């Protein structure tokens, strides 16, 4: 039977060597702890960098916007524009250099011409927004006490919501931008914030002129055409009434001279008929000869037919305009087409009746809008004075 031997691990060299070996074994190496310490230091450094970046971002922040216009300045601009337009006879083209000089020293000393024009553009856009809300039956929700007064003055300048006249503001802004390079203006005082406009916005301005009766003439293509036709028909009727004076039994026509005296000129029946025909030609009325046929003009065209066609076109346009303004809302495209075709095929009498009634309603609506604008301006002034 084999007996196991015990192996002696002790060194043969003596006790000193044995102690060195044991001490060496009792202090093993630990490289993982060094790596952990290095990674911890790296993470701490990254967190420190992130905190520094966040502090820098907080310190930068958005730039402060300093308000350089106040409510009184805006009202002064609008009042000045109303007074200037009244002084220049409501000229559609505004001389902005002259207007800037027209403003008081309180505005000229604080703001440059470009800043004034930029503020007018913003006031105009603000008025457009309020006007659209009012037209839709919504409350404009004026947030400042001066907003109602500013709206009253703005309505006197750009009222009625029909914009399209060129007042030369775009060209003036482009010219100022070319002169100053980046659009900045200097008038001797430091400007904290420059109000710059971005994009290519097409400014449209509604200029209104008052005629002798106080009625407003709206310079819009369709409205101008309708009003011109209406004025033309009224002038034709007045001309006929002036010239178709009654004749006495002897065929004498009563003619009043400039001094108010009446002179009687004897004329034959044929001469009086010729005069009536001449006046009818001036009034563009239908010419009818003795046989009832339409009288032809020199170039061979029939004057009565042309006049009839013009009347038909005018009536059709009026009926179509009334349909689009009153009935077309809420209808689909197919429904609009069917309804419009039926209206276009109406009889002459019915179509003329609808056309005349719609024109009368348009005139009444314009007069009512004028009264509303004047009342709003008076109301704003009364509120400001009190």
From Swiss-Prot:
Residues 216-226 have a biased composition (Basic and acidic residues). The lineage of its organism: Eukaryota, Viridiplantae, Streptophyta, Embryophyta, Tracheophyta. Residues 221-285 form a coiled coil. Residues 257-267 have a biased composition (Polar residues). One of its GO terms (biological process) is regulation of DNA-templated transcription. Expressed in the apical meristem and young leaf primordia. Detected in the vascular tissues of cotyledons and leaves, in hydathodes and at the base of flowers and siliques, but not in roots. GO terms for molecular function: transcription cis-regulatory region binding. Residues 354-375 are annotated as: Non-canonical leucine-zipper. Homo- and heterodimers. Interacts with GEBP, GPL2 and GPL3. Interacts with GEBP. Probable transcription factor. May play redundant roles with GEBP and GPL2 in cytokinin responses by regulating the transcript levels of type-A ARR response genes. Involved in stress responses. Plays a repressive role in cell expansion by counteracting the positive role of CPR5 in this process, but does not regulate cell proliferation or endoreduplication. Its main location: nucleus. Keywords: Coiled coil, Nucleus, Transcription, Transcription regulation. It is found in: Nucleus. Belongs to the GeBP family. PANTHER family: BNAANNG10740D PROTEIN-RELATED, GLABROUS1 ENHANCER-BINDING PROTEIN-RELATED. This is GLABROUS1 enhancer-binding protein-like 1. Residues 291-300 have a biased composition (Low complexity). The keyword DNA-binding does not apply. GO terms for cellular component: nucleus. It comes from the Eukaryota. Residues 1-58, 197-314 are annotated as: Disordered.
